[in-house]
């Protein structure tokens, strides 16, 4: 289970068309807001700096951290692994878990998706399976071997093309091997959770919940939900149905055991399910930052993804928007800076005014990359920062669509003190329905769309009838 950061995705999607700022220490919106803050928050474990830089900050809830570590230590006692290990919750809204060094991490986004302690044990056990079998080291050695072979092939044949071919084929084989590692980690994690006294079907129900969440994410993007069960030859993970099928033949998968659902729900009750305030909040198709006091509104069909590096917006027609801010000094006009510093140099550069502030708008030079559609760059001065949008539209409707994206960039504005003060993270609450129907519970959610679908996915059920059978229900409150 590996989560991806936004910047590599931006480089892949935008390529040379991205509005690339000079590399002399730019500061993102999130890092600007968080500048000067200490490494550890109250209640959060202090991680080694190099590990926190890689995985993200820990969540500031001492009781929840202790609870998760306690479940992990219970599994570790069954694993027979030497050394000491820590289990920690990361302050990230995405659903994920992974292991690094002597740490096993779960995100609060994953905790929100799970239904009981047994499923948490399944997630932690899966990652202990990776650690116990030294999968990370195996992959690193295998990857280096592939790269060495590629270099040797290029030298012997005198052909860089041959070297690239060897590297490509070898890395694909390595990815296939990675799928075997995932299935092995499922088996080992299953054995651990059963020996620790948890229900054996928790591994399957964990995978099924992650599958449902992935299907819902695809639905939000207008994609086919069943595509989550299809994988290509280049996939780094087995498809969920492949993992579920592999578990069916293992007797332990049906072993009885504890769920500890009440204790689990009590531990996550009140947990944030939102972005951290220093990174701003996504509210439907709006981005609002309470510390920088800025915001903008994307087109209605856009899905926004927030990250410490910036905000990525993806439209149903695969149009793209990327937003961030920098404290890099930009003397003179923004139009002049854009003309002299951005490469390739934009065309049709216009000075503009957005939110009563200086702005500049430019276009990608025609012919600079025929593989891309319409690209626009929008820069706005905001106090001692410059905020910028990279906009991309492809397809037959790209000319009209790019103007829609520019109009979205023009919604950039400064939030009032009252607006900023009113912004708080959404939180998970565990409630007793007390006769409230699924429709009534769904209507209370603070989202503008897919209310029922969100409620069902959050509780890991397929329909309202299944939800009605739950004695306690998870919901989201502002």
Question: What are these regions, as identified by a protein language model?
Answer:
Residues 20-157, 171-174, 191-207, 212-228, ...:
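Peri-catalytic and regulatory segments of divalent metal-dependent proteins
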Residues 273-306:
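N-terminal "mature-domain start" segment
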Residues 451-478:
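Extracellular LysM carbohydrate-binding repeats and other cell-envelope/extracellular binding modules
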């Amino acid at each position: 289970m590996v989560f991806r950061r936004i910047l590599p995705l931006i480089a892949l999607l935008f390529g040379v068309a991205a509005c690339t700022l000079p590399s002399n220490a730019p500061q993102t919106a999130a890092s600007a807001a968080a500048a000067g803050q200490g490494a550890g928050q109250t209640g959060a474990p202090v991680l080694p700096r190099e590990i926190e830089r890689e995985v993200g900050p820990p969540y500031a809830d001492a009781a929840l951290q202790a609870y998760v570590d306690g479940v992990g230590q219970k599994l570790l006692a069954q694993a027979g692994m030497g050394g000491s290990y820590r289990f920690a919750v990361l302050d990230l809204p995405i659903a994920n878990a992974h292991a690094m060094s002597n740490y096993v991490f779960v995100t609060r986004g994953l905790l929100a998706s799970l239904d009981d302690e047994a499923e948490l044990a399944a997630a932690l056990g899966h990652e202990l399976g990776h650690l116990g079998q030294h999968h990370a080291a195996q992959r690193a050695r295998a990857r280096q071997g592939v790269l060495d072979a590629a270099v040797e092939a290029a030298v012997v044949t005198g052909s860089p093309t041959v070297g690239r071919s060897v590297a490509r084929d070898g890395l694909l084989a390595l990815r296939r091997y990675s799928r075997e590692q995932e299935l092995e980690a499922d088996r080992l994690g299953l054995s651990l959770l059963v020996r620790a006294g948890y229900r054996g079907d928790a591994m399957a129900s964990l995978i099924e919940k992650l599958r449902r969440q992935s299907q819902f994410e695809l639905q939000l993007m207008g994609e086919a939900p069943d595509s989550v069960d299809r994988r290509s030859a280049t996939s780094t993970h087995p498809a969920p149905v492949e993992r579920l099928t592999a578990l069916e033949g293992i007797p332990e998968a049906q072993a009885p055991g504890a769920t500890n659902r009440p204790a689990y729900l009590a531990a996550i009750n009140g947990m944030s399910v939102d972005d951290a305030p220093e990174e701003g909040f996504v509210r439907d198709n709006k981005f609002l930052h309470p510390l920088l006091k800025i915001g903008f509104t994307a087109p209605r069909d856009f899905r926004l993804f927030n990250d410490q590096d910036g905000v990525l917006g993806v439209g149903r027609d695969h149009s793209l928007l990327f937003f961030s801010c920098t404290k890099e000094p930009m003397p003179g006009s923004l139009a002049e800076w854009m003309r002299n510093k951005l490469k390739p140099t934009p065309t049709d550069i216009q000075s503009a005014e957005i939110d009563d502030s200086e702005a500049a708008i430019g276009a990608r030079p025609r012919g600079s990359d025929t593989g891309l559609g319409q690209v626009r760059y929008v820069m706005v001065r905001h106090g001692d920062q410059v905020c910028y949008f990279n906009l991309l539209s492809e397809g037959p409707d790209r000319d009209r669509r790019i103007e829609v994206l520019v109009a979205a960039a023009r919604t950039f504005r400064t939030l009032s003190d009252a607006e900023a003060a009113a912004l708080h993270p959404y939180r998970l609450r565990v409630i007793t329905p007390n006769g409230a129907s699924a429709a009534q519970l769904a209507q209370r959610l603070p989202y503008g769309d897919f209310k029922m679908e969100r409620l069902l996915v959050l509780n890991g059920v397929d329909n309202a009838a299944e939800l009605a059978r739950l004695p306690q229900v998870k919901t989201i409150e502002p």
